[in-house]
């Protein structure tokens, strides 16, 4: 159900009857305060200005032709021409009952499902994932889950960095170990980070090692079988590390979703040939460059986008163009979403402009670069270890689980050690994810253990606790939530506020999907839980003296809140528990 969409359709019909232009935006919004109704139609002011008429008079004409008697108990004009819509409690009650009986909580699937390619996580292989990979991984996964929930066909693409000069460096270091008698089948790559660091130190400091590494890159790119065997060893080890992190994070990416850089190797020569044939790329100092006037600097100099090095080597740019061609022309994507650090904005602007010119992106394909900000430490600098090193993502998650266990140990509980451990895992992982996802995607944010693990405020532990409180009501009542289908009555203002919020889930998901911003769902779930707490204090459910029909009506509201929290948190990749 989408109340806003219903009102938009009714408002357009009324405005058409009044004679407003067909492209007039009805400007339907949720009201910010109950005294302004539940929704507002704000079209009259802008339309009246264009038509040089009185906005209140125009608003009255719209109301006179607005057929909302089935859902609204009152419409009124406020201020310069706002139309306030007060929804019928009966309409809300019937809609809540229907949503409670529906597996998808009355959230409709898209009328015209799209094929959406989502490029997310995409770590560089050869070393372990670090905290810098968190945002792309969990933001992208939340959007993927929401798209699938609404019925879109989603193609996950984990564009892992599995090619490039770093592999020549690693192969050279490994070859030296093998030459010293280390058995390739037993070589210790468990600590990839240490292996990479040792190889990098040799690359930077040891005479002759860098040349050796570059020679191995040439061999690898030339298809040398031995180099390829060693390369695959690094890839397999890296992928295994990544998969362990994905499982810990409760992320839906699997090995089948990997579409790494090397997957496009066979296409890169053709990409360059086409760019040259169409005079899109030209030679400059031996390299192939696309000059983009659309991104010219303040002096009018076009942006230079290098697609092939002077020595003939390919770059990220070449691979990204090949990925555009594959996703748009071969997969037939309607949308391509790419979740990458905001610092790569220029690069992806260059990619899209070049791909459009070359035909690698069809006009019908929406190419959406979805940048995100940085996780910062208390010093307002990118999050690091105390010694200034990179924080491994696996270590961060483990610490969060341990901290959650300590917090939970402070609470009285008769749960077993195994149950406590499982709850700590869900709380710890959920806390990290919600703390990140609840911030606007493009914003930097400061990482803070105390706030994210708090059981108060906008946190995962607070929402998880709210869910467990509702489940405990059903255990106490003896009512089977799965078969509960009582009639709902909306009398108290707290009941109405809660019912209205419950019925706005689809609107929230629409915004989240359109703008690729999970924080709107996070905010909605917190508002819902807060309204539930207010409702529960004001509207007794199981207290003595509550009429059975009132009790059952309120139990339906409680049940739908719990299902909405569970569904919403699941869309964020956060697990709930029956007890805490």
Swiss-Prot record:
One of its GO terms (biological process) is arginyl-tRNA aminoacylation. Keywords: Aminoacyl-tRNA synthetase, ATP-binding, Cytoplasm, Ligase, Nucleotide-binding, Protein biosynthesis. GO terms for molecular function: arginine-tRNA ligase activity; ATP binding. A motif ('HIGH' region) lies at residues 123-133. It is found in: Cytoplasm. The keyword Nucleotide-binding applies. Gene3D superfamilies: Arginyl tRNA synthetase N-terminal domain, HUPs, Isoleucyl-tRNA Synthetase, Domain 1. It is an enzyme of class 6 (ligase). Its EC number is 6.1.1.19. It catalyses: tRNA(Arg) + L-arginine + ATP = L-arginyl-tRNA(Arg) + AMP + diphosphate. GO terms for cellular component: cytoplasm. It holds the Pfam family DALR_1. Belongs to the class-I aminoacyl-tRNA synthetase family. Monomer. This is Arginine--tRNA ligase. It comes from Pseudoalteromonas translucida (strain TAC 125). The gene is argS.
């Amino acid at each position: 159900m989408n109340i806003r969409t219903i009102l938009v359709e009714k408002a357009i019909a009324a405005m058409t009857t009044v004679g407003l232009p067909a492209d007039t935006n009805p400007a339907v919004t949720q009201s910010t305060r109950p005294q302004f109704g539940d929704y507002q139609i704000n079209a009259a002011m802008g339309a009246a200005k264009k038509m040089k008429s009185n906005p209140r008079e125009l608003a009255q004409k719209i109301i006179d032709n607005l057929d909302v008697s089935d859902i609204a108990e009152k419409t009124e004009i406020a201020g310069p021409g706002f139309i306030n819509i007060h929804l019928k409690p009966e309409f809300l009650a019937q809609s809540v009952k229907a949503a409670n009986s529906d597996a998808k909580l009355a959230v409709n699937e898209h009328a015209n499902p799209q094929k959406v390619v989502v490029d997310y996580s995409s770590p560089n292989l050869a070393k372990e994932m670090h905290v810098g990979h968190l945002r792309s991984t969990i933001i992208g996964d939340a959007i993927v889950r929401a798209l699938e929930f609404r019925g879109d066909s989603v193609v996950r693409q984990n564009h892992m960095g599995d090619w490039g000069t770093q592999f020549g460096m690693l192969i050279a270091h490994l070859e030296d170990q093998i030459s010293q008698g280390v058995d390739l089948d037993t070589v210790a790559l468990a600590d990839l980070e240490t292996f990479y660091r040792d190889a990098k130190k040799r690359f930077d400091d040891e005479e002759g090692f860098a040349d050796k590494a570059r020679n191995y890159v040439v061999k690898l790119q030339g298809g040398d079988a031995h180099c390829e065997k060693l390369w695959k060893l690094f890839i397999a080890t890296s992928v295994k590390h990544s998969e362990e992190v994905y499982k810990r994070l409760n992320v839906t990416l699997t090995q089948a979703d990997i579409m790494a850089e090397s997957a496009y190797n066979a296409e890169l020569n053709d990409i360059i040939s086409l760019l040259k044939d169409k005079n899109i790329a030209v030679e400059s100092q031996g390299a192939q460059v696309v000059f983009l006037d659309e991104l010219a600097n303040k002096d009018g100099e076009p942006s230079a986008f290098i697609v092939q090095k002077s020595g003939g080597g390919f770059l990220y740019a070449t691979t990204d163009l090949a990925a555009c061609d594959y996703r748009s022309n071969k997969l037939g994507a309607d949308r391509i979403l790419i979740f990458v650090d905001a610092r790569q904005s220029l690069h992806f602007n260059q990619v899209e402009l070049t791909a459009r010119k070359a035909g690698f992106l069809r006009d019908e394909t929406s190419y959406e670069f979805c940048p995100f900000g940085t996780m910062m430490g208390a010093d307002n600098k990118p999050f690091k270890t105390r010694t200034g090193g990179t924080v491994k993502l696996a270590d961060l998650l483990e610490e969060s689980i341990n901290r959650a266990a300590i917090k939970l140990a402070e609470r009285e509980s008769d749960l077993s050690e195994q149950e406590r451990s499982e709850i700590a895992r869900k709380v710890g992982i959920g806390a990290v994810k919600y703390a990140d996802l609840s911030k606007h995607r493009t914003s930097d944010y400061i990482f803070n253990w105390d706030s994210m693990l708090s059981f108060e405020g906008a946190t995962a532990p607070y929402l998880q606790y709210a869910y467990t409180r509702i489940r405990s009501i059903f255990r106490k009542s003896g009512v089977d939530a799965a078969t509960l289908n009582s009639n709902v009555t909306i009398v108290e203002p707290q009941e109405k506020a809660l019912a209205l919020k419950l019925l706005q889930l689809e609107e929230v998901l629409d915004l989240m999907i359109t703008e690729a911003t999970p924080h709107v769902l996070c905010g909605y779930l917190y508002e819902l839980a807060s309204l539930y707490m207010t409702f529960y204090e004001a509207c007794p459910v199981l207290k003595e003296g509550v009429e059975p029909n009132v009790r059952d009506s309120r139990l339906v509201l409680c049940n739908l809140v719990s299902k909405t929290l569970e569904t919403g948190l699941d869309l964020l990749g956060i697990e709930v528990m029956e007890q805490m």
